[in-house]
């Protein structure tokens, strides 16, 4: 249990979702609809902690580590995006979660789209922030040969070990993309994104080989094919690409989901939710307001 405070009361839990994978997540007390937060490639559940804390008084946030990340299992590669979807579907079914607000950034957003399409009876609303969905590019066949991208090569060369958490924090905070993150977001990520090693040091909780495998499998994503099958109310935050990494969420995403509304954030880039907590919280509250009205009308 974390330190006292309404938004800080969370516990680390884990659930076996397949023979090879156990998913870990921070869970807050139930004070309203369940919100399930899905992070981007290479990050961890702690990235969403400030957002969760700001809506914990009216919801039940669940911030989880995708397979290969944080405290979740790290099975061998490949890390196909379809497996990430299968994990979340299995979690919602195993725990019998319904009336869920699903929130995703980057690969987490793509995963959220596909989970909502597969489980419309359980997912009541979506908030997608810079979801990696490419309607104009057909998915590649599984195992299709392609030379490693510069992104993958850089990822595999990334430094992943330090003598202490403090050293890791200083090293990472001085470098992009972490140098532009909100201070609370960075603190939450450092808490779950860096873990102790047996020799007394620390290392990234998402090994570079896992992150590289997720990047390699991007072209196999079929999330774009599921956009039209999303039936729940959807709020989309899209960056203009004017800051840091370019936007990965084209306008076609909002245009293809029948129930979507889109907010374009000027002067922002792909790491929007990690730099601007308030933008995401505004969308979360809008979704929770809508869910509350829908629940009242049903009753």
What role is predicted for each listed range?
Residues 1-37, 56-59, 97-98, 285-299:
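Alpha/beta-hydrolase fold catalytic core
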Residues 24-74:
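Conserved HGGG/HGGXW glycine-rich cap/lid loop of the alpha/beta-hydrolase fold
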Residues 38-40, 105, 238:
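The conserved beta1-alpha1 loop
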Residues 50-53, 62, 66-107, 282:
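Active-site loop/oxyanion-hole signature of alpha/beta-hydrolase fold enzymes
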Residues 98-142:
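Conserved hydrolase catalytic core segment
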Residues 138-201:
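Helix-rich cap/lid subdomain of alpha/beta-hydrolase
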Residues 184, 194-255:
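Conserved serine/cysteine hydrolase catalytic core
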Residues 268-277, 281:
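Catalytic histidine-centered segment of alpha/beta-hydrolase-like enzymes
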């Amino acid at each position: 249990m974390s330190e006292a405070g309404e938004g800080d009361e969370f516990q680390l839990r884990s659930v076996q979702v397949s023979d090879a994978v156990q998913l870990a997540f921070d869970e807050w007390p139930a004070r309203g609809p369940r919100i399930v937060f899905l992070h981007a490639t290479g990050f961890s559940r702690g990235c969403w902690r400030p957002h969760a804390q700001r809506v914990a008084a009216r919801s039940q946030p669940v911030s989880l580590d995708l397979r290969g990340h944080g405290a979740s299992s790290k099975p061998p590669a490949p890390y196909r995006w379809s497996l990430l979807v299968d994990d979340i579907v299995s979690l919602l079914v195993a725990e019998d979660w319904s009336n869920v607000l699903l929130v995703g950034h980057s690969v987490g957003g793509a995963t959220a789209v596909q989970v909502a399409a597969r489980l419309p009876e359980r997912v009541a609303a979506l908030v997608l922030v810079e979801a990696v969905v490419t309607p104009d590019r057909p998915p590649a066949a599984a195992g299709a040969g392609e030379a490693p991208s510069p992104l993958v090569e850089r990822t595999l060369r990334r430094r992943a070990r330090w003598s202490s958490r403090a050293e890791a924090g200083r090293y990472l905070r001085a470098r992009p993309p972490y140098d532009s993150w909100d201070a609370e977001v960075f603190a939450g990520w450092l808490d779950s994104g860096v873990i102790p090693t047996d020799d007394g040091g620390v290392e990234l909780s998402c090994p570079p080989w896992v992150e590289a495998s997720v990047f390699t499998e991007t072209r196999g994503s079929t999330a774009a094919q599921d956009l039209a099958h999303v039936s729940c109310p959807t709020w989309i935050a899209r960056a203009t690409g004017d800051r840091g990494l370019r936007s990965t969420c084209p306008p076609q995403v909002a245009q293809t989901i029948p129930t979507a509304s889109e907010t374009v954030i000027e002067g922002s880039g792909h790491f929007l939710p990690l730099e601007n907590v308030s933008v995401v919280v505004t969308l979360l509250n809008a979704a929770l307001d809508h869910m509350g009205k829908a629940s009242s009308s049903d009753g």
